[in-house]
């Protein structure tokens, strides 16, 4: 695999871009106009996927927030049947909304399964 390349003008990461006129692969900065010809024509794509709960910072006070709706959803950690919930966007390729539950007894955050 190749190393990341950085812009010599603003130090942001360079991204692959096709130069259709010269028919070469270039590495271009998304922040300024800098670009350079890529040393190789190989492009690697890395996709990282994680759950919404891992990406969401849950306030410890969420379970005591009177404005959040409540549910009798069972907590997978303590098996109590009371949780507050709210919606968040998925960070994956789709734009579906996901329900995040926070147990009012132990504060554990979990997604609807």
UniProtKB/Swiss-Prot annotation:
UniProt cross-references to InterPro entries, sorted A to Z: DNA-dir_RNA_pol-M_15_CS (IPR019761), Rpa12/Rpb9/Rpc10/TFS (IPR012164), Zn_ribbon_RPB9 (IPR001529), Zn_ribbon_RPB9_C (IPR034012), Znf_TFIIS (IPR001222)
Zinc finger (C4-type): 7-32
Subunit and interaction comment: Component of the RNA polymerase II (Pol II) complex consisting of 12 subunits.
Task performed by this protein: DNA-dependent RNA polymerase catalyzes the transcription of DNA into RNA using the four ribonucleoside triphosphates as substrates. Component of RNA polymerase II which synthesizes mRNA precursors and many functional non-coding RNAs. Pol II is the central component of the basal RNA polymerase II transcription machinery. It is composed of mobile elements that move relative to each other. RPB9 is part of the upper jaw surrounding the central large cleft and thought to grab the incoming DNA template. Involved in the regulation of transcription elongation.
Ranges of compositional bias, category Polar residues: 54-66
Disulfide bond annotation, renumbered to this chain: none
SUPFAM superfamilies: Zinc beta-ribbon
Cellular component GO terms held in the UniProt record: cytosol; nucleolus; nucleus; RNA polymerase II, core complex; RNA polymerase II, holoenzyme
TFIIS-type zinc finger locations on the chain: 71-111
Protein name: DNA-directed RNA polymerase II subunit RPB9
Entry keyword set: DNA-directed RNA polymerase, Metal-binding, Nucleus, Transcription, Zinc, Zinc-finger
Lineage, opening ranks: Eukaryota, Fungi, Dikarya, Ascomycota, Taphrinomycotina
Molecular functions (GO terms): DNA-directed RNA polymerase activity; nucleic acid binding; zinc ion binding
Major location (coarse): nucleus
Chain positions covered by the region annotation Disordered: 54-74
Family: Belongs to the archaeal RpoM/eukaryotic RPA12/RPB9/RPC11 RNA polymerase family.
Compartmental location: Nucleus, Nucleolus
Any single biological process term in GO: transcription initiation at RNA polymerase II promoter
Amino-acid positions noted as binding Zn(2+) 1 in the UniProt annotation, renumbered to this chain: 7, 10, 29, 32
Residues annotated to bind Zn(2+) 2: 75, 78, 103, 106
PANTHER family: DNA-DIRECTED RNA POLYMERASE, DNA-DIRECTED RNA POLYMERASE II SUBUNIT RPB9
Source organism, top-level taxon: Eukaryota
Protein species of origin: Schizosaccharomyces pombe (strain 972 / ATCC 24843)
